[in-house]
Amino acid sequence: VYKERYEEMYSVYSGNKRISNEDALWKVYDNATAAIAKTRKDVAPIDVVPYQDDRWFNTVHTIIGPWEMGKDFSNYSCKDFNFDYEIPESGVWHCKEGYGSLVADMYKKTPVQLNTKVTAIDWGGSGVKVSTDKGIISAKKCIVTVSNGVLSSGQIKFTPNLSAEKEESFFKISMGHYNRVTFKFKKLFKKKAKDNYLYYRIDKQNTSSPEGFCVTINPSDTKLCMCDPGGEFGKNLAKAGIDASLDFALSELKKIFGNKINKDLKQSHVVNWSTNPLFLGAWASAEPGAFKFREVLRQSVGDRIYFAGEATAKDWGTVNGAQVSGINQAKKIVSSI
């Protein structure tokens, strides 16, 4: 039963042929994850992973790097990857109606002021004054939940200035790059696929950022196909524009499934979080040698400014981690007032 379910969930292709014996891929994958786990050092995976000349290395690099971390092997810390984060045993699955719909329904009775840009936070007095494009909000305390991409960009000015170490944490727990190119088909080109993950052999070797992506097919029976280029390659692809992202993703799928998928294509959509001014990246992780800044980032300032969001969460890289971290910080504030 496990083998059948496994084969339903994962597909591996070399060119246009599905591989039934995937040992070559998983050998490189298992050795890479084992090497990262074994080191327990605050170094980059590229310094420790073996089989870097193997023909499946770029695919493994894509899975463990840009797909899981939003970063290439040279840009994140093994210690951050290995840290014992509190990931729910139930797993994280796609919401068919969209996660935004879930959040909107869950908090529909919560008073929220949308489309209000914060430009400054003054914490020099006994409380805080939050400057927005719709006026100033005064409070005893506040929670900052924006991404480290926004924090490191300087869009929000803090007065007095934050400590040098706190400022540095915005840069050291840096944003990865992970973009989503989604296609909707009249019918799936892969039969019986549901919540299926597809990996393929990425041929171009000797690149610091693999030029490919992993694919999620038919999440929650939506008939969608989500291609997720990430890392520096994904960042540069986003800069090239929406058409470039669509063309690249569709051309890679055609190499696997052939030009016949064109006739079943209904819609396409591209999300480039790296170019979105509200995020300026996908999610955050520690750079090599910078794992200690995770804790620095979580610390409150003057018992008045609290920080939450996925970069501070122990359920890292997830929307539920961001939600839980915000709830936890709110509870701290309520108990302290």
Residue map of PLM features:
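FAD-dinucleotide binding site
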Residues: 1-337
